[in-house]
Amino acid sequence: MTANTTAAPALHGAGAAMRLIVASSVGNALEFYEILVYGYFAVVISKVFFPAADEAVSLLVTLGTFGISFLARPVGAIFLGAYGDRKGRKQALTLSILLMTIGTGLMTLMPSYGSVGLAAPILVIAARLLQGFSVGGEFASSTAFLVEHRPDRAGFFASWQWSSQGLAALIATGFGVLLTSGMSAEALQSWGWRIPFAFGLLIGPVGYYIRNTLSETPEFVEAGAAHAPLRDLFIGQWDRLLLTIGAVAASTSSQYILVYMPTYAIRELSLPQSVGFTGAVLAAALQTLAVPFVGIWVDKVDTGDDWRGDLVHGHRLSSLRAARC
């Protein structure tokens, strides 16, 4: 084993547990934060990178570009998941947050359509694909990292994945409220929309550093590298795979209602931008506070080892997300 695959003793102290939660959840929070920022400021971004005579067409193209990132997610999930099974959870997590930071940096510094023409939307698409690729492998790898470090409290520790998304939503919507209420439309379109992306860019290196301070999970060190993780998945775990896809698809679809909420309020209801963002803040606060309590309940009602395996694969833990609906 290399130094990177040396396991630390079980992290049972309060400080060690918090460090584990922060290190594991920071990437998940960053990816959801960046997704929300793009979705929340879609109206502005559409004018900067996808100008069209019809604003509705411009917005649809912007949201379509947002959807392109989902095409890269399965590829990223397969690649980074298999990479984590071979090289370790820590290696996969440091790689995913590095790729996410690069994608966020591209959005922060991206020149407008007025500056570079057609190159601008092409670069936006490239940034979304990179972001989607890294996000695809982040959630499962970081959840496995948490659960494998603390299998005795798997429900509680894994619940912070959803709670961190709520916190990310609070920060993103906070930026939305402040910027839309405190800046003119011209300033927001000129440079103000870049501020929340720049904030996300600052989080990335911090998360990368924190993750490098943690050791590999005891479970991975004990089991060793998997030589054919994809073959094992499709042959031996196909039933769990199908169940996971269905459960995550159902729960994730509800999550993106939160992303579209401000845009819907602006375009369809003709409400001020701040109103849509305020509604999103309330939903995010509920998610942040409620989900860890559901995680505690999950640990209390757990009665079998098979629950742990299901938890790692994600299809039972997906019920935690329903707590914020």
Task: Locate the predicted segments by residue.
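Extracellular/periplasmic helix-loop-helix junction of adjacent transmembrane segments
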Residues: 42-75, 122
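Extracytoplasmic gate region of multi-pass secondary transporters
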Residues: 38-39, 238-287
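Hydrophobic core of transmembrane alpha-helices in multi-pass small-molecule transporters
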Residues: 116-136
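Flexible cytoplasmic inter-helical loops of multi-pass small-molecule transporters
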Residues: 212-229
